[in-house]
Amino acid sequence: MAASAKRKQEEKHLKMLRDMTGLPHNRKCFDCDQRGPTYVNMTVGSFVCTSCSGSLRGLNPPHRVKSISMTTFTQQEIEFLQKHGNEVCKQIWLGLFDDRSSAIPDFRDPQKVKEFLQEKYEKKRWYVPPEQAKVVASVHASISGSSASSTSSTPEVKPLKSLLGESAPALHLNKGTPTQSPVVGRSQGQQQEKKQFDLLSDLGSDIFAAPAPQSTATANFANFAHFNSHAAQNSANAEFANFDAFGQSSGSSNFGGFPTASHSPFQPQTTGGSAGSVNANFAHFDNFPKSSSADFGSFSTSQSHQTASTVSKVSTNKAGLQTADKYAALANLDNIFSAGQGGDQGSGFGTTGKAPVGSVVSVPSHSSASSDKYAALAELDSVFSSAATSNNAYTSTSNASSSVFGTVPVGASPQTQPASSGPAPFGATPSTNPFVAATGPSAASSTNPFQTNARGATAATFGTASMSMPAGFGTPAQYSLPTSFSGSFQQPPFPAQAAFPQQTAFSQQPNGAGFATFGQTKPVVTPFGQVAAAGVSSNPFMTGAPTGQFPTGSSSTNPFL
């Protein structure tokens, strides 16, 4: 009977203990805040976990710890636990503990947990006597409450009127037109600036119509209707890219019959008004007269005066006509290229016409203001498109061997070439270099344009110890270098190719000479490796050279040899 009563009492105590364990502040360990305490610290009356119970036993003095599920509690112990618990223990043992100033240790480290428990129980660092615990707890609660209220009131949003006061002026938004007026004025100013720099504003209008004069330097920039049509002082680049500028001085030999101007080099001309700017005639090509020494074909001694007098007819009345058409030079160039196609056969590149230049070049008059602007270019076209005498795409083969530097007259040819019989072989000009001496009349005439004394060596094949050029295919043509080592340069006569002479821009020879003929007689074109008969060299620098293969002494008058 007594045993059953005791068992019932223990069950009642265990139930009361479990009820205390279920309280909110007792659900965690008092020392490490771990959930689900399993032990009770009977020394202080707190609920702790298993790990902290072992640490509490190691303190000095050791704490008395009991298991909740494996031990029995007396009525006095249950009453003690009811009076204490984790909440009361916190007020006593952690009454002075500040969470902000005191660091909570890492409870995963047993050493730190032990040190924390020693500070807490042995040294009583944060201990408060039980009679003062409630007062201190109430004070801390009031302090924490006031701090919490202050921190919560700090981010509180207050009305603006409370800060400015009742006498603050009213703030009006989105009403001020003065605040928008600077923006409008700025946008209008930007539009005006954009109008000044609008280059493509008048594409729909006539580009050749005379526009309204503008005083700004950038008003007529890239406006192609302003070529020489406005006053020079209105723009810094009044004459920029003026294509009336293909003129030379009247005394010089003109290349393609471009109209000339009588003013001096780099002298500003006042076509549209008084020139008030230094760059008024910038890139004005009328200001660049050519000297007679820089003209093409000026090496000729017998034709230079003739061409100067003949082609000078093209340069007429250009300087005095300030209102002439801007594209008259181009029109003359077009006439030069298109006129005078009458002849035996048309040529593609370097044709030689029969008619002289004077009869081909048509000189249009620039007396009217509406004359063609491409006149000078047309005249140049007529000069280059003179009557041809051969169907060769590059040069003529009628009793003349044309070269880039001049013709090489010879007396006779072992193999007669019919005039206009067919295209000449490639490089068919024997010794056409004006800077070397003429070769002799022997059968081994050298065709090397850079050789001075040709030696008639026998034909050598590949692998010979010579300084000659590599041999080709076909009939061997002898090619010797200026050194003592000589070999053979076997070059086949290519029937589809011919030499490359310059175009004839001056007086035409009857049998079709090259561009710069130098007034010499016309030789006969021979194949590349054939023998050229004795004759007088057309080299202007080798007039007195002997005809032998090995000229001796100072017989050569070439200043470059």
Curated annotation (Swiss-Prot):
SMART domains documented for this protein: ArfGap
InterPro entries according to UniProt: Arf-GAP_FG-repeat_protein (IPR052248), ARFGAP/RecO (IPR037278), ArfGAP_dom (IPR001164), ArfGAP_dom_sf (IPR038508)
One Gene Ontology MF term: zinc ion binding
Keyword Phosphoprotein assigned: yes
Example GO biological process: acrosome assembly
Composition skew (Polar residues), residue ranges: 176-191, 442-451
GO cellular component terms given for this protein: cell projection; cytoplasm; cytoplasmic vesicle; neuronal cell body; nucleus
Keyword hit for Acyltransferase: no
Subcellular location: Nucleus; Cytoplasmic vesicle
Keywords: Cytoplasmic vesicle, Developmental protein, Differentiation, DNA-binding, Glycoprotein, Metal-binding, Nucleus, Phosphoprotein, Repeat, Spermatogenesis, Transport, Zinc, Zinc-finger
Zinc finger (C4-type): 29-52
Positions bearing carbohydrate: 367
Paired cysteines (S-S): none
Main subcellular location: nucleus
Region (Disordered): 171-193, 409-451
Modified residues (Phosphoserine): 167, 181, 362
Modifications the protein undergoes after translation, according to the UniProt entry: O-glycosylated.
Domain Arf-GAP, chain residue ranges per copy: 11-135
Modification Phosphothreonine occurs at: 177
Subunit note: Interacts with EPS15R and EPS15. Interacts with FCHO1.
Role played: Required for vesicle docking or fusion during acrosome biogenesis. May play a role in RNA trafficking or localization.
Protein name: Arf-GAP domain and FG repeat-containing protein 1
Lineage per the UniProt record: Eukaryota, Metazoa, Chordata, Craniata, Vertebrata
Gene for this chain: Agfg1
